[in-house]
């Protein structure tokens, strides 16, 4: 059965792959929709630690890149496409790699333009100390699966009871992973340009403290005194497992761990006020810290 499934996915890859923007080679979860977040991973064996290594990456959505479990994403919020223009990234990952097994993992979420199947294009290239080059790309040998408890459709939904950070480790073993296919022909075509648009990386610019707080038994309103682009971050302690918070309409479900943090993981908003509501039984005392994370424009 396993080999039959692999044969089907490989056939889909051949049938659905076609001319790519900027030479990109797209991969997609075989059964995509408008809101699911998808996890991608692949283990590569390197003969020695590379002298230089880079990743070229493009996406129709928002992505986060991990190398050997370390976050290698240049931006806090990494947007793959803007106004139908593909934002290509080149990321130096030399310091993250080692001799032997190396795992590359990507967390994908849909972007503003709802493109179901142009999810990820990734190339790994570089050279060793003896000047021998190497090259790999994301293809049908990678693995992918939907993120359980995570979706993004204008607003984020994140269930921290289900999420495990181990998915991006080499030792992680779990069922439900399948091979990706190529992009489908009914998907969005991005604008061709002679030169790639200048892509500025958004960084943490300032951590803001609340200017004013209004609380009641059902929730609160946090006023930071001025509008900023970024996210609020709540540090939560001793919340009951399954407690649900809504932050400006974005949903966060508590894991029940002693300390956890609720914030926007996929997108940034330009806001001055944040309205938070919560389940019965949650208390203001469960929130030990409130911060506004302002990012550079």
What do these predicted ranges mean?
Residues 1-21:
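Bacterial Sec-dependent N-terminal signal peptides
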Residues 20-297:
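Extracellular/oxidizing-compartment recognition motifs
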């Amino acid at each position: 059965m396993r080999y039959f499934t692999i044969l089907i996915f490989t056939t889909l890859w051949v049938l659905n792959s076609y001319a790519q923007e900027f030479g990109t080679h797209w991969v997609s979860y075989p059964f995509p929709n408008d809101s699911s977040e998808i996890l991608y991973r692949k283990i590569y064996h390197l003969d020695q630690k590379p002298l230089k290594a880079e990743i070229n990456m493009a996406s129709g959505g928002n992505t986060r890149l991990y190398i050997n479990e370390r976050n290698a994403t240049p931006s806090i919020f990494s947007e793959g496409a803007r106004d139908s223009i593909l934002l290509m990234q080149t990321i130096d990952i030399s310091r993250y790699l080692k001799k032997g097994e190396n795992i590359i993992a990507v967390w994908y979420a849909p972007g503003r333009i709802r493109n179901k199947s142009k999810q990820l294009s990734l190339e790994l290239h570089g050279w060793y100390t003896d000047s021998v080059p190497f090259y790999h790309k994301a293809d049908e040998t990678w693995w992918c699966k939907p993120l359980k408890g995570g979706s993004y459709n204008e607003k984020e939904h994140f269930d921290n009871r289900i999420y495990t950070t181990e998915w991006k480790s080499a030792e992680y073993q779990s069922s439900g992973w399948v091979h990706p296919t190529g992009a489908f022909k009914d998907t969005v075509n991005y604008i061709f340009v002679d030169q790639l648009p200048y892509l500025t990386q958004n960084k943490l610019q300032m951590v803001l403290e609340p200017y004013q707080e209004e609380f009641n038994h059902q929730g609160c309103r946090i006023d930071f005194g001025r509008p900023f682009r970024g996210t609020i971050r709540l540090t939560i302690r001793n919340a009951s497992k399954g407690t649900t918070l809504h932050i400006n309409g974005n949903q966060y479900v508590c894991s029940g761990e002693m300390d956890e943090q609720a914030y926007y993981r996929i997108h940034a908003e330009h806001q001055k006020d944040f309205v938070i509501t919560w389940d019965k039984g949650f208390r203001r005392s469960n929130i030990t810290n409130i911060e506004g994370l302002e990012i550079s424009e």
